Amino acid sequence: MQDYRTPQRRPQRPQKPQKRHRRRSFGAVMLTILLCALLCLIGIFAAVYFMGVRYIQVRISDTSYVKFLGMVDDEGYPYKGRIIYSDGISAEVNLDRNQIAYSNGDVYEGELNRNLLKEGRGKMLYANGDVYEGTFVGDLISGEGTYTYVNGDVYEGSFANGVKEGAGTYTFADGSTYTGSFSNNQKNGSGEYRFAEGDAYIGTYVNDLKEGSGIYTYANGDVYEGQFVADERSGKGTYTWSNGEQYIGEFQNNMMSGYGTYTWPTGREYTGYFENGIIVRAAESAGT
C-alpha cells in the first residue's frame, strides 16, 4: 500500500556566522581606537599649547630665516627654546639669562629683539677664543665696540654690518698701533701707524696699503715725506737721512728713480737723473 506520509526534510546544517558581521565589529573597534588616539593627540597638543610651547618661523630676508621651537611669553614672543638658522647652525636660547648658545661653540650674552636677533649691547664669545663686546644691530656687530682676538690683537672703534667701519684703534700683540679710518675691515683713509720697533707713518691708506701722501719716520732718524703707491715710496718726495743728507725728487719702488737733487751736509749738490738709487746722468746746464 502506498505511503502518503509527507516526506521528511533533511535537517539543515547550521549556518556559519557571516564574516561581514565580524568585519563590521572589527572596523568599529578600530574606528573607536583611532578616535580615542585622535582625541588624545588633540589633548596633548592643547596641553602643550596652553603650556606656551610654539613653533615660529621668522623670515629675515629672501634667503635667510630663523625657526624657533620652544616657550613663548604671555605676548606670544619666544624666550626659551631651540633656534635653527637658514645656514644650518642651531642654538639654544634662554632669555631668562639673555643667552644664546650656538651649536658651533659660540656663546652670546646680551640683548635680543623679539625675533631673537642680537640687538643692543652684548658680548660674543667665539669658539676660537675671540671676544667681542659692544653693540649689535640686526644680529650683526654694528656701532661701537671692542674686538679682542685670540692672538692678542685688539680693535676698539666703530663697526658696521659685521666689519670694521669708521674711526678706530687697532693694537697689535707686538705693541704696534694704528689709529685712524677703516672701511670694509681694512685701513682706508687717514691714519697713524706706530710700529713697535720705533718707525711711524702718518698719512693715507687704501685697502690696508700706504697710498697717497704721507710722512714716514724711521727709528734711526731718517724721514720720508711724499707720495706712496701700493705701500712703497713712489712719486715725488723728500728723503732726509739722519746724517743730514737729503734727496728731493722722484721715487719708484722705494728707490730714487727719475729726476732729483741730492745734497750733502758739506753743501755739495748734485742734480740729475737717478735709476734704482744710482746716479746715471747729470742734468744738462742751461745754454748747453
Model-derived features: positions:
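N-terminal Lys/Arg-rich, disordered targeting/topogenic segments
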Residues: 1-26
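Beta-turn initiation residues at beta-strand->coil junctions
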Residues: 58-61, 83-86, 100-105, 123-128, ...
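Short low-polarity hydrophobic stretches
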Residues: 27-30, 112, 122
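Ser/Thr/Pro/Gly-rich low-complexity linker/stalk segments immediately outside membranes or between
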Residues: 48-76
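Hydrophobic alpha-helical membrane-insertion segments, chiefly the h-region
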Residues: 39-49
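Conserved anchor residues at repeat-unit boundaries in beta-strand-based tandem repeats, strongest
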Residues: 67-79, 83-96, 102, 107-118, ...
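N-terminal Sec-pathway targeting helices
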Residues: 19-39
